[in-house]
């Protein structure tokens, strides 16, 4: 939004994952506007919650007729692609629905520099010819491109399916362990798992305590998240073992149930 330099009277922000608020925003678009673009995340990076894609698309479809070029949907699924959906194809696969413009990265599930924009041939040619953020930029290096292709081929193989199933099992193990400890999280199958701590000092102390026990987790405090939503973000990956997850849960038990933590 900042790079596009869209005037404030030509844009609106709808509430997080809220189809009703999206409908309100679309209803407020004045007559005469030729095109509306609705942009959202497939997986919200801070909390691992998924967009209600089918519900959002039902709203955009209901308003499509009002605009000459319709309502164009754009989804950034950087945290979904490779790690979410039955075969790792992300939020679209999980929801059984498609957006017009699909944005992703090779830097998360695939472990390589670079990213991509997917859409119709006409759209991609328009990006090549007209996108200020693309024109005169350097292409992806040959080594990164080859590594991305190799990673995608692994993900789209029997080995990749096995890794994805293992990732889902370890994610379920960790989420179930948090619940058993009485710790607050946000439900969902995604391997980004938030632990809602709701205290800056406690987040910092727990992140340090985890690090001292050989566990790397990211603390999120104000202004990255609103006050009262202080969180520790855990990222489960396909290399984690059942024992790794058990160790992390044991560390959390020690940190949250010791007298010093009360």
Place the predicted regions along the sequence by residue.
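Active-site phosphate-binding strand-loop segment of PLP-dependent enzymes
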Residues: 9-74
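Pyridoxal 5′-phosphate
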Residues: 15-22, 36-38, 66-68, 78, ...
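Active-site PLP attachment segment
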Residues: 93-126
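Amphipathic alpha-helix from the class-I
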Residues: 145-162, 176-181
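Conserved PLP-binding catalytic core of the aspartate aminotransferase-like
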Residues: 163-172, 179-214, 224, 229, ...
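PLP-dependent enzyme catalytic core of the Aspartate aminotransferase-like
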Residues: 212-216, 224-262
């Amino acid at each position: 939004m900042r790079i596009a330099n869209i005037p404030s009277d030509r844009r609106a922000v709808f509430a997080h994952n809220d189809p009703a608020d999206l409908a309100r925003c679309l209803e407020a678009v004045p007559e005469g506007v030729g095109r509306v673009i609705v942009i959202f995340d497939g997986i919200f990076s801070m909390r691992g919650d998924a967009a209600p894609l089918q519900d959002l698309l039902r709203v955009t479809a209901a308003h499509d007729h009002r605009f000459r070029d319709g309502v164009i949907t754009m989804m950034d699924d950087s945290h979904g692609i490779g790690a979410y959906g039955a075969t790792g194809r992300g939020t679209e696969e999980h929801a059984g629905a498609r957006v017009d413009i699909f944005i992703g990265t090779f830097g998360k599930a695939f472990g390589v520099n670079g990213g991509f924009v997917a859409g119709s041939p006409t759209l991609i040619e328009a990006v090549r010819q007209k996108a200020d953020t693309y024109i005169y930029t350097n292409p992806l290096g040959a080594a990164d491109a080859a590594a991305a292709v190799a990673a995608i081929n692994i993900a789209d193989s029997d080995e990749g399916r096995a890794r994805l199933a293992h990732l889902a099992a370890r994610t379920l193990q960790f989420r179930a362990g948090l619940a058993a400890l009485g710790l607050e999280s946000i439900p969902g199958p995604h391997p980004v798992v938030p632990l809602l701590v709701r205290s800056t000092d406690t987040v910092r102390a727990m992140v340090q305590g985890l690090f001292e026990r050989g566990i790397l987790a990211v603390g999120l405090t104000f202004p990255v998240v609103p006050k009262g939503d202080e969180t520790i973000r855990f990222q489960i990956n396909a290399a984690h073992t059942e024992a790794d997850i058990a160790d992390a849960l044991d560390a959390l038990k020690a940190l949250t149930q010791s007298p010093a933590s009360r």
